[in-house]
Amino acid sequence: KASAYIFTNAKGYVTIMLPLVKQHKYHVIFYEEDGSELFRIKTIKDAELILDKTDFIHAGWFSFELFEDEKLKEKSKFFLSRD
C-alpha cells in the first residue's frame, strides 16, 4: 500500500506531506533496498517537503521509517525512477 505521507510525485520527486507538522515532531530515516541506512532527516518543520532525486544517488526501491513524537508512525517503501 502506498504511503499517504512519503511518496513520489508526478514529476518523480520524493514528497513528504505532514499536515500535522505543527502539532507533532517528525523525523524520517531512508534506507537502501538492502536495508542499509541511506540518510535521515532529523527534524521536519514544513507540511510539504520535496527532496531532489540526487539525494538518493540512484533509481530503484527505497524504504523509510517515519516517526511521530519518537514513535514509529509508518514503515513503507517507494520506487524512484530514472529521468
Please place each PLM-identified region on the residue numbering:
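Glycine-centered coil/turn sites that cap beta-strands in beta-rich domains
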Residues: 2-6, 10-25
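Intrinsic-disorder/low-complexity, polar/charged segments enriched in Ser/Thr/Lys/Arg/Asp/Glu/Gln
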Residues: 11-15, 46-48, 73-75
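Short beta-strand/loop motifs in extracellular/secreted proteins, especially
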Residues: 24-27, 60-62
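Short, glycine-anchored, charge-dense loop/turn motifs used at functional sites
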Residues: 31-37, 62
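Aromatic (tryptophan-biased) beta-strands that constitute blades/sheets of beta-rich domains
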Residues: 39-40, 74
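A generic structural motif
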Residues: 42-44, 79
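Short, surface-exposed loop/turn motifs with a glycine/proline- and acidic-biased composition
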Residues: 44-70
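C-terminal tail/sorting-segment detector
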Residues: 65-83
